Amino acid sequence: MKNTTNTKRTKFIFVTGGVLSSLGKGLAAASIGALLESRGLSITFQKLDPYINVDPGTMNPFQHGEVYVTDDGAETDLDMGHYERFTNAVMGQKNNFTSGRIYHTVINKERRGEYLGGTVQVIPHITDEIKKSVRQLDGSVDIAIIEIGGTVGDIEGLPFIEAIRQLRGDLGRDYTLFIHLTLVPYIKTAGEVKTKPTQHSVRELRADGIQPDILVCRTEVPLEENIKAKIALFCDVQQDAVINCVDVDSIYKLPIALHAEGLDSKILELLNIWTANPNIKPWQDLVENIQNPKNEVTIAITGKYVDLTEAYKSLHEALIHGGLANHTKVKLRYVSAEDLESGDPDSYLKGCDGILVPGGFGRRGVEGKIKAITYARENRIPFFGICLGMQLAVVEFARNMAGMSEAHSTELEPNSPDPVIYLTKEWFDYRTNKIQRRDENSDLGGTLRLGAYPCVLQQESHAGDAYGTQEVFERHRHRFEFNNDYRQQLIEKGLVISGTSPDGDLVEIVEIEDHPWFVGCQFHPEFKSKPMQAHPLFRDFISAAVANKKG
């Protein structure tokens, strides 16, 4: 009898960080995934975040940065974006867990009596739930790369460190690998690097029961072999397991840099895996493209969170990808929408080859964004509006082209006499084949139209030309929609509806007639763009910007 049991066992790489935060664990993990994938291995990722929020969906972008949305509607950490951009892995609900989500699950189990009246504790109940979350990935791929958020030594991260310590015992050394990312600072006045922070970070990790197998040392300058030998001696790792990660001027150079240091080879050696030689030529070609652009354009991003560009991380990268597809260097000019409200648009936007208004929530800076849209429309500058940016493009058009001077969104002006954008209280969910319902009293968290939905395109439109197909799936994160009561009236004034839901009820893409390139989309195309495969709308937006610059 044929055995149909899936016997594949996944090997796990755990990535921790020390010394300080924002060292780039997510990019390091993504680069490791890219290198392993280039050797023919199947990979996936998981991010374990120590904060108590259930997910980042309701967190302030100034504190957390971007909320990255997956196809299945998960609101996740921005590192999910790095994972998807660098590899073919598809992220979802099972790829991002927070302390809040773990504790929520455990408390619900306790309320249901699943612990049979026992005392619920961090060990074993919380750590067991963390391990269960990690082991969901077992058997699905060759390698799962698990990033532990925060910094070793943080009190809130201790349950996760303890859980992965236990997992080594549960799974065995052949199936687990610990990589620790640290900082080796360069003291310019002394002209030397200092290894002590790395030594102390590893000591902290070892005190929690974990001996790292590989150290990835972030530095400003290359490490000499004697420095690597010193780190290896004091941290009890092999010298060729001390990987120098020198700062690079483009994140897309990182896989090549880590490969040159032998990181992927060392990982395979320690996990006892044999593979084909890596194919890193696509990354080399990408870097060649980055370093030798044929054109240069300036794109203005008129937004609310311009003081923290991490809030627009995927947007930033997608514009770079659009540039790469056109062999063009993209310079970004972040313009505060609040400043624009009281300022002259010409002083902020003059000289820009394209204008983009991104998504966001709340009324702060809204009139500044509308002024930017008017400037793009009147001056025939390529314009791209995303989510709220698309909604405000409709508002601007209704006000200035259709005679509705008080047109607005009910999110921003509930008593508007012409609510061209309004709260959608029900819609058809094509993933579940059910009607979804929301109202003004619904919780903020997890109640938006989230995840991938189909969009049917109108041919002979900018969107139709960009995609070159009839139907696409794009990711959403919003509550408010185009009000169909105004559809015909706006179409008669020159608004083009070039994308809708399959039933035609939900407006997904709008354009305007007689403009070189003016597109607004209700979804977030930036979440599906990759450096080697730019999203079609970003590709064509940058192409239009290049044409605009050339006149």
Curated annotation (Swiss-Prot):
Q: Which residues cross the membrane?
A: none
Kindly list the positions annotated as binding UTP. S21, K194, T195, K196, P197, T198, Q199, K230
- Residues bound to CTP: S21, D154, I155, E156, K194, T195, K196, P197, T198, Q199, K230
Which GO-annotated molecular functions does the record name?
A: ATP binding; CTP synthase activity; glutaminase activity; identical protein binding; metal ion binding
Q: Which biological pathway?
A: Pyrimidine metabolism; CTP biosynthesis via de novo pathway; CTP from UDP: step 2/2
InterPro entries registered for this protein in UniProt: Class_I_gatase-like (IPR029062), CTP_synthase (IPR004468), CTP_synthase_N (IPR017456), GATASE (IPR017926), GATase1_CTP_Synthase (IPR033828), P-loop_NTPase (IPR027417)
Entry GO CC: cytosol
Positions that bind Mg(2+): D79, E147
An example Pfam family from this entry, by short name, is CTP_synth_N
Q: Which residues bind L-glutamine?
A: G360, L388, G389, M390, Q391, E411, R479
Which HAMAP family does this UniProt record tie to the protein? PyrG (MF_01227)
The misc remark on file is: CTPSs have evolved a hybrid strategy for distinguishing between UTP and CTP. The overlapping regions of the product feedback inhibitory and substrate sites recognize a common feature in both compounds, the triphosphate moiety. To differentiate isosteric substrate and product pyrimidine rings, an additional pocket far from the expected kinase/ligase catalytic site, specifically recognizes the cytosine and ribose portions of the product inhibitor.
Q: How does it assemble?
A: Homotetramer.
Indicate what this protein is called per its UniProt record.
CTP synthase
- Biological source species: Desulfotalea psychrophila (strain LSv54 / DSM 12343)
Q: Which gene encodes it?
A: pyrG
